[in-house]
Amino acid sequence: MERYDKERLVETVLYVLNKTGELDYYTLLKTIYFAELKHLAKWGQRITADDVCAMPYGPVLSHLLDAIKGDSHEPELSRMLKSAFKFASEDASNIMLPLRKANEDYLSESEKEALDASIQENASLSFEQLKNKSHDKIWLKNYREGKGKKGTGCRTIKQIHSRYKYTKSDCRNTTSRNIPHIPAR
């Protein structure tokens, strides 16, 4: 990921955490994921440039998940996130708290609208509700294909687009920054 994309990802995380006050990282990941789908469906562009991968509990932004868990191949992203949030305590090691306000200059109004809508729809859902909501046919196909194989199971943008019936001509104004090719890691 380019530095700008990492900064946007961190500011997106902070935006959601500032709006909610605190969130467990599973709910945070799903809230951002569903905002990505909303923004893609309406505008033909994603909010972040992170890879979306099929994991056992549904699709996730993979670089963000790895960085949150301290398992990142992106040390710069990990450092940036450490200065942006903290975990609540040892007893609540999955609850994230913001350490500063988000720099909203990194987000467009349409991106903030998609994030706000996703926060309203998803931030109060249980783990099970979020898991069920995110387990669709595309996730299942990618997860089955990649199960047990390191580096497989990532969704492609084409598959995400097809879910929302976008064609190449619908997305002609997109850029690689907004909608990257999502390679298998």
In which residue ranges do the predicted regions lie?
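Domain-edge interaction signal
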Residues: 1-185
